[in-house]
């Protein structure tokens, strides 16, 4: 699991998230990454980056988990993350958003866009309003056809493991067909995790979850890269909806694993992949606005 540590305020949450989703059998499972921009590096920034890496290693060491610390020069953060994923064969990336962050919207727009285009690995974008280990419930909104994505069973495993470790219930919301597949998978592989399943008739009904998600709950929204099997144009409205109705909740948006190398993933909706940038840019701009509000 790759953890970029650009923001010292999100490091603890990201490392703790990685600790509860990682496979206990995997050795050297965590890689902390500090990217130094080729164009505007300074000694001060390099020192801060080093401190960030050390902080990540210390938090994981408390749980007796080693961290590989990587500092690299690259053109930008997205490029640094993508290169490190390849070099260290990372299977997942967790990115943090601080609730009071004030980041330039084009920066996050570009980061999200470049990262999701540049890797087919699972990407989690997380914002925590409280420490990970104090969460009382995990609510997961799952879109139709999510069961056909190659990363389906992996993200289910991650959150069932998280629920088991934290001792909290994992509550899945999906349409009937997807819910049936979720129930089969959980029964077969994660029977020990306390789970609950509720019908979410239409993906548009996501807003009905406002009554289900308390302050000490984590809301996980399963999304998908543009052009993938479960991608839906309504995902473009997600940012605005989440920002408006779930701004007081800890939140993870997850983009599951996909088959093939990034450039091989052709779009079902549009083989030429038009409008992809537009979509990710919207997500990026929304994150910026949302973060400024909180």
What are these regions (language model features)?
Residues 1-213, 219-228, 255-256:
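Structured cytosolic domains appended to multi-pass membrane proteins
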Residues 14, 231-233, 263-265:
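Short conserved micro-motifs at the rims of enzyme active sites and ligand-binding pockets
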Residues 108-110, 234-239:
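Charged helix-capping and loop-helix junction motifs
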Residues 153, 238-240, 270-272:
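Terminal export/targeting leaders at protein ends
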Residues 217-218, 225, 240-253:
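C-terminal functional regions that serve as terminal interaction/effector modules
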Residues 254-294:
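C-terminal functional extensions of proteins
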């Amino acid at each position: 699991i790759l953890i970029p540590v650009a923001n010292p305020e999100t490091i603890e949450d990201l490392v703790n998230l990685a600790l509860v989703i990682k496979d206990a059998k995997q050795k050297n499972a965590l890689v902390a990454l500090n990217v130094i921009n080729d164009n505007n590096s300074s000694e001060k920034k390099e020192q801060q980056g080093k401190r960030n890496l050390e902080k990540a290693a210390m938090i994981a060491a408390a749980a007796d988990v080693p961290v590989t610390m990587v500092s690299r020069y690259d053109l930008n953060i997205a490029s640094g993350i993508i290169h490190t994923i390849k070099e260290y064969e990372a299977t997942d990336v967790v990115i943090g958003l601080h609730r009071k962050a004030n980041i330039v919207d084009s920066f996050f727009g570009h980061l999200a866009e470049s990262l999701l285009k540049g890797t087919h690995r699972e990407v989690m974008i997380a914002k925590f309003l409280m420490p990970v280990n104090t969460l009382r419930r995990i609510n997961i909104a799952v879109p139709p056809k999510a069961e056909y994505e190659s990363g389906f069973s992996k993200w289910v495993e991650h959150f069932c493991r998280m629920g088991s470790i934290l001792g909290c219930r994992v509550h899945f919301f999906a349409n009937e067909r997807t819910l049936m597949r979720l129930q089969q998978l959980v029964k077969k592989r994660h029977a020990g995790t306390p789970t609950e399943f509720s019908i979410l008739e239409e993906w548009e009904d996501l807003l009905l979850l406002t009554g289900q998600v308390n302050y000490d709950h984590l809301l996980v929204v399963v999304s998908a890269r543009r052009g993938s099997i479960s991608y839906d144009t309504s995902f473009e409205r997600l940012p605005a909806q989440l920002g408006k109705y779930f701004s007081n909740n800890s939140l993870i948006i997850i983009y599951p694993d996909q088959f093939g190398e990034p450039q091989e993933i052709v779009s079902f909706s549009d083989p030429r992949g038009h409008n992809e940038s537009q979509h990710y840019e919207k997500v990026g701009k929304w994150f910026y606005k949302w973060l400024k509000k909180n």
